[in-house]
Amino acid sequence: MTVSAPFPSKASADTAVPQGLTPAQAAEGWLLLFDGQTAFSWDCPGKNAVREGVWHLEEGSTAWPFSRFGNHWELVAEVAGPVRLYLPHEHVLEHNGDSFDRLQVVCNGKKIRYEGKGFSRLSSVERPAGPPAATIGITAPGPQPARLRHLRLRPQQLQPLWNGRNLDGWTVNRADPKRQQARFRITDQGELLVEGGPGDLVSTVHAADFILQFDCRTLGKHLNSGVFFRCIPGQYQNGYEVQIHNGYKNNDRTQPLDFGTGGIYRRAPARRVVSNDEEWFTVSLIADGRRLVTWVNGFPVVAWEDPRPPHDNPRQGYRAAAGPFSIQAHDPTTRLLFRRIQYAPLPPRPNSHPTPQLP
C-alpha cells in the first residue's frame, strides 16, 4: 500500500518544496505532518479536503498518521473549529473556537504537557476505532468542519548511531570480496566521508522498528548512495534501502531519477525530489512494521506499506526482523558526507494496523 496524493500543479526545478519548514526547523529534525497541499501520509477514510493551505475534515471524519512516532516527541499545530485530538495515555484535547489557535504538545514517556489557548482536556471520552498504538488521532465532532494547518512534529531523545569521531560501532562489510573498493574516513570537521565503491559500512546496532535521522551532502552531481536497514546479518546490502539520489527528469522534481532521495529503492519512489546536490539535507525514516515513511528536509516523500507475504529475505517479501544498518558506497564516482546519524527504537507495537473506522 502506498499512500500518495498528486500535487495540484507541476512544480519547476527551482522550487524545492511548495510549502515546507524553514531550513533551521528542518535541520532541527522537525517533520511536516501536513504538507499544505494534500493529506499525504494520513489514514483518513472520512470526507476531507485541502483548500488554500488548510486541511478541512467534515463532521464525523477521523484521521490517523500513517506511522507511530515513539514515546518522546513535540507536536505543534494550528487548529480552528471543533476538533478533538487523541493523544497517548488517554489524553483527549478539544477545541471549539472558530479562529485558529496554536497548540504545542510535548510527550515525554508517560507524561503529556500541552499549551494552547482555546483547548480543554476531556475525560471519559471513548477513543474512536483506529490503530491502537497511534501517536495521535484527530476527529471532527461537527457540525462545522475541523480545520488544521502548520502541523509538524519533532522526534526527541534519539541516540547517536555514529559517534562523529571514529568508526567504532561500524565495520566494513567483507561479505562480498568483489565489492571492497570503498573508502570510509572521518574528516577534520567530524563528518563521515564515503568515497569510491562498491562497498558497504555496517552498524553493530540492529533494529526492526525505529526512527532514523541523518544529514547528508553529495560532493558531485547525481551521485548515488543509500542507507540500508533491517539487513540480513552477514550478507552484502540485503535489506530495505532508503535511497540517496537528487536527480530528476524533465525539469520536474516530481519525476525522480532512480527512485529519488527518500525513496524506498525498488519499492516506492519519492513523490518529490526535495534535496539538492552539493548542499546538506536531512533524511528521516520511520520503519513501523510493514509501514515505511520518509521525509527529506522535513517534507514527507514516501508513505508505503509492504504488501508482500512475510519472508526472511527482504528482496523476496516483507521482512520484519531486526537487522543492521549499512551505508552504501555505490560506485567509483561516489563521494558523499554524512553527519548526525541518530536513531531511536520504537516501542513494541500491535501485530497489525487495523483500518480506521468512522466513530
Give the role of each language-model region.
Residues 1-4:
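Bacterial N-terminal signal peptides
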Residues 7-359:
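Carbohydrate-interacting regions of secretory-pathway proteins
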